[in-house]
Every structure is written in C-alpha cells, then in structure tokens.
Amino acid sequence: MINFSSFYQHIAQDERLFHWLDTLPAQLSEWRAHALHGHFASWERMLENLPEITPTELNLKQGVIANKTPALSTGEQLGLTNILKALMPWRKGPFSLYGVNIDTEWRSDWKWDRVLPHLSPLKGRLVLDVGCGSGYHMWRMLGEGADFVVGIDPTQLFLCQFEAVRKLLGNDQRAHLIPVGIEQMPELNAFDTVFSMGVLYHRRSPLDHLWQLKNQLVSGGELVLESLVIDGDEFQCLIPGERYAQMRNVYFIPSAKMLKVWLEKCGFKDVRIVDENVTSLEEQRKTDWMVTDSLEAFLDPLDHTKTVEGYPAPKRAILIATKP
C-alpha cells in the first residue's frame, strides 16, 4: 500500500519543510479515507505485483532509463509490460525500463530539452514540481543533480504511475509525489526552484496561482513557468468558450508578453521569455500506451493552425523568473 512515511521522516529532519507536517498528514489521511478513486485499489495491486528489481544501470541524465545485468527474459518483460499497461493511460514520459519502452502521449523529454539550457544549475537544490503528472520531469531533475524533489499532483493514477517507476528505479527516495494541489500547501518559502508546467491555463485565477508559486520559493529562488500562450503584445489574452482543443477547464491563455507582465505584477524580478514553441503532432500523439484521442483530433482537420473550435493551435512559452 502506498504510504508517505518515508517522506514524513525526511521533511521532519529538514528545517525548511518540517512545518508542512502541521497539516499534511491529516490531509492525506482524509484523502485515503474519503477521496480515493474507484480504481485506486486495483492500481495499488498492480504496484504490489511489480517485481523487485535493482538496476545495474540507471541513467536519469539522458532520459529515465533503467537496465540490469543479466537482462530480463522475454517472459519477464512481457509480465512487466502487462502490469504497466494496467496503469494506462501514460501521458508524460517516455520511460525505458529493463527493455520495456513506455511510449507516452507526450514527448516530455523534448520539453525538458527546451527548458534545461535556461535553468540555474539544479545541483544540490530543493525542487518543487507543481502539477507534476506521473513524475517524468522529477527524475530528470534528479539527473541534473537536484538534492530532493517534491512533486504535487492530485490525480491518483499519476501517483500510482510514479510509484511504479520509483519501484523499478530501485525504490529511489530522493523524489516524492504528494497527491495535493498547491492551494492545499502552506506557504513554505522553502524551495530553491519551483516548476509549474502546463498548469496555469487550468486556473480560474492565474495571478493567484503565480502568488502561490512565489510563496513556495526562498528569496532568490527561481520559478520555471510553462504555459499555453497566444501570439500578440502585452495586452492580448484569449478567454476561450466552453472548450479549447476539446479541454473544458481552460480559462486564460495570455500572450507570452502579457504573462511576463503578470509575473512582474506579482513581484517577480528578472523575468524573461526563453522559449516559444508550437506543439507538433510528433510531440503529442496517440500511442500504444495512450490509445484515446490526442492532439491531431483536437485540431481543425483542414487547418492545423487552428483548434477544432477555431482558436489558435496550442503554443507554449517558457518563462524564467526570480523571487526577490
């Protein structure tokens, strides 16, 4: 059964994080007692069925890659594949685990390649990843030398996927996924780097989200913000109707320049737009590990520069900012 005792033990010994123990255990007890997904028990059984494997080769620098010598047999690989496929859909990755290649909907490694050149070095840093999904980028952060990585995401399938990968990486305790939203966190002012990637446009109040991110950073800490944007000057913002690219919960899509103004309005300094990129059909697509509709189905079939609703097709910007 998934439990958070190792995380509690770690933060109890960390003066930057131990105040979180005032609220978190009660929140997670309430979550387990009253808020579990209907499939959660079956997902946990899949975790219990995973083999105990210690990698002899672990590469978190070029990807999330684990291998062992001797290699798994064909039958063992098939058994591992079947367990991991019971945790579908896999959206963020990819993962290469003992010959089983999880080809996720998103090529999250491509996003990481766009982000990485602009980061302050992560070596030795305490990192928070907000809306971390199944945790792909958390492992890449460790690959860049982060000391400890906390991911938060309330989606329970993502928690189970993260715990599956963790078990297959030798039960690595340097990263933990906590199933809460940022609005449930106290203002810790603790993290050296905070990532929020693919979250802002799902927020009814985007400036409140930026303040919440700021309140998790130490003074001098770095925010890495990635979000949907539109073309235009600092006065341009799209407020979609009921759906955007078939997503219901999209509220504000500013231009990158407006997003920079928002960050400055919230008191961040040294705000810079470091990347803008139109999402390609190669970066987000249907795979054997995510078999429902993906980006291609969300775009106008006659004009891929538009969504099916007629809005500009998804474009994403990365901004870096510093808390004074």
Swiss-Prot record:
An individual GO BP term: tRNA wobble uridine modification
Q: What class of enzyme is it?
A: transferase
| Binding-site residues for carboxy-S-adenosyl-L-methionine, renumbered to this chain | K92, W106, K111, G131, D153, P154, T155, I182, E183, M197, Y201, R316
Q: Does the keyword Transferase apply?
A: yes
List, alphabetically, the SUPFAM superfamilies matched: S-adenosyl-L-methionine-dependent methyltransferases
Annotated catalysed reactions? carboxy-S-adenosyl-L-methionine + 5-hydroxyuridine(34) in tRNA = 5-carboxymethoxyuridine(34) in tRNA + S-adenosyl-L-homocysteine + H(+)
Query: Out of the domains of life, which is the source?
Result: Bacteria
Single GO molecular-function term?
transferase activity, transferring alkyl or aryl (other than methyl) groups
State its Enzyme Commission number(s).
2.5.1.-
Q: Which UniProt keywords apply?
A: Transferase, tRNA processing
Identify the NCBIfam families for this entry: PRK15068.1 (NF011650), tRNA 5-methoxyuridine(34)/uridine 5-oxyacetic acid(34) synthase CmoB (TIGR00452)
| Complex and partners | Homotetramer.
Functional note: Catalyzes carboxymethyl transfer from carboxy-S-adenosyl-L-methionine (Cx-SAM) to 5-hydroxyuridine (ho5U) to form 5-carboxymethoxyuridine (cmo5U) at position 34 in tRNAs.
Family membership, please give it: Belongs to the class I-like SAM-binding methyltransferase superfamily. CmoB family.
Q: What is this protein called?
A: tRNA U34 carboxymethyltransferase
